[in-house]
Amino acid sequence: RFRAIGPEEPRAVAGGGGFSGNIRRTAMRSDIMKKGLERTPHRGLMRATGLADEDFKKPYIGVCNSYTNIVPGHCHLKKVGEIICDAIREAGGVPYEFNTIAVCDGIAMGHSGMKYSLASREIIADSVETMGSAHPFDAMICIPNCDKVVPGMLMGAMRLNIPTIFASGGPMRAGKTEGVSHNTDLNSIFEGVAARVVDKIDDAQLHELECTACPGPGSCSGMFTANSMNCLCEALGIALPGNGTIAADSPERVEYWRRAARRIVELAKMENPPRAKDFVTAKSFRNALVLDMAMGGSSNTVLHTLAVANEAGLKVDIKDLDEISKATPNICRLAPSRGEFHIVEECNRVGGIMAILKEIAKKPGMIDGSAPTVSGKTLAEQYAAAPDADGTVIRTLDNPYSEKGGLAILFGNLAENGCVVKAAGVDPKMLVHKGPAVIFESQEEACEGILGGKVREGDVVVIRYEGPKGGPGMQEMLAPTSYIMGRGLGSSVALVTDGRFSGATHGACIGHVSPEAAAGGLIGLVEPGDMIEIDIPNRTVRLDVPEAVIAERRKSWKPREPKIKTGYLAKYASLATSADTGGVLKVN
């Protein structure tokens, strides 16, 4: 159902998949800034950076890094950039490294900093576009690793549309905590806070969690947003196999970075090199969404895939995602989830993303294996080389975790344009639920209320005015959802919000409610005690209040004054759309 918007440029594609290509004989994109008499001053500036005569004949590779030492997913990327730049030089290219910002959602969680997280995605996209346009690189390798950085770089890459490979920093290993029988991660610490409040654990146990759950560099362990998006890059064909699952601190990862660097130089040297949009097409986009449902990715992937599709010129409706979910068996369940689940390291050990795709492709109509990839092979050629599903970490089609995908899109009067729930992480007892609304006007208010005992069994927590426009910035709700879990209410309390959730969230947590409260959505008219009905199997969420009463409430509703009136967030709020369109910025 996906289609391109506008005319497609004709592209010569060598072979069945791939862009094997010939050595370039025509002008390079970088010649715009380095060739000819008029570019003598430009060459003078580049010589000041260390270039010699022979370097002006080589392809220029933009190395888009997101290094910062405050973010564990990015603290090692300075070294990664060095490894990749060295490999580019060895392969005959000239690397030019530049940086984007990177916000750690975990560190920004639960305070005003979280308002900047989603908004940072747009800054990252703009930065990639700006650097790659002001300095016309022949190709680009992107080194993202955290939640908004992956989609932000993807959006920027779509705008530039030059040969591009994504080579992420890799996932963090799972934590091993004394006294805890299962693997731990960031989510374990958040839940530990609530458990400490009600004396389920003591100070020493909480400190042990704090010190061991996040053992080293990498994107947070688990199928959270960053790891989900890095995995989807493999299915999109814009990353080599292993991008989403090879551990950040492993020797295998170092070789992965070198291999990606060598390959981007090969692409740049081709006579007719494939560009980013040659990989991110309607067919590869559908492949990525099927993978998302098969592995039960983060609910935030819905938000980001819609935004990337918009930049790629693809028309994708949120309803399309639910149709794919209904048809896609969930065959791999990685933390965080309910019941039996595994960790990213285990998934990598049994074949990673290619093994998941190999199994899901056995169901007719699921995967289009003819999609090209940056490796030069088709997607089918790539996953054909993967091991068969092991039956435990990656289940077979005849024994899935569920017949439907891990994410579900719900509709109803409370979310006329849709909302999202990670169905794979919902307690079976909460798949259908009806309860009274307990309303909070912000995440901060909700955290205080939940920890203060204002939420009881059976309630439906409503957190509103936290959408892209109303927040502004659409804060993640990991803290309140973790507090619900930590207080032992995960199997009896639901949460509904126009904000979003961390990929670490699990439980009956329904987010991305559209239209949001700030845009006049019905969620802004809910009153304390109103009954809310949730039916995930039938994809509905509704406010059980007579239409006449709703109409009267709507008459008295007025838009609220913006929470922030200066700076970037004020600009962001004025341009942001609701979640059903990816929360992208629209300029009238």
Model-predicted regions and their roles:
Residues 25-73, 80-101, 106-107, 112-117, ...:
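Catalytic or ion-coupling anion/metal-binding cores of large enzyme and transporter domains
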Residues 117-126:
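Glycine-rich, highly charged phosphate/nucleotide-binding loops
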Residues 132-153, 165-168:
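A short, small-residue-rich loop immediately preceding and capping a beta-strand
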Residues 1, 10, 16-27:
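Short, Lys/Arg-enriched N-terminal segments with co-localized hydrophobic residues
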Residues 1-7, 34:
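Short intrinsically disordered, low-complexity coil segments enriched in acidic
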Residues 5, 22-23, 167:
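Intrinsically disordered, low-complexity serine/threonine-rich segments
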Residues 5-11, 547:
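Generic low-complexity segments that are intrinsically disordered, proline-rich and/or Lys/Arg-biased
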